[in-house]
Amino acid sequence: YINSAREGVKRLGSLLEQYGTYEKNGIAFQDANEIWWLETIGGHHWIARRVPDDSYVVMPNQLGLDVFDLEDALFEQKEYMCSADMREFIEENHLDLSFDDCFNPRDAFGSHEDSDHVYNTPRAWFGLRYFNPHTMKWEGEDADYTPESDDLPWCMVPEKKITVEDVKYVLSSHFQGTPYDPY
């Protein structure tokens, strides 16, 4: 059915537009040249963004895209794609208060629930902190981001090459080496 990551996004996107979905979800499509991240936002609507070549994504169980270029998604589709009626959906439901083609879908479609601060944002924070320990201040009163931050970056350029062992460590994390370690 598909021969590339881009085709995967378009194929799943067309199925979502036709059949819809009950809940929000995300899925990555990868080929030898690029990676795309698609998020369903409920109903028959979806958005997708290409992961920059030099970047990584830490994605817990919540919507994560933090920047979205609607103009590119609806026309050129160089870095972004979405369901055909996304602009109308956003306008009709008053989901973008910036009135700009470049908006934050996490704010428009995502959640900022207390449960996110227990189950989701801490996992993203730990991974970002692990892969970029010096890029940002991750702890303390003057931290750029904390485990409860709702504005964690969706993607970042790592400070060093990420290894399989690094990924295993982050995926098995219980926040070891931080004040948030429950053990």
Residue ranges and their predicted role:
Residues V9, G13, G20, A32-I35, ...:
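C-terminus-biased signal that marks the final domain/tail of proteins
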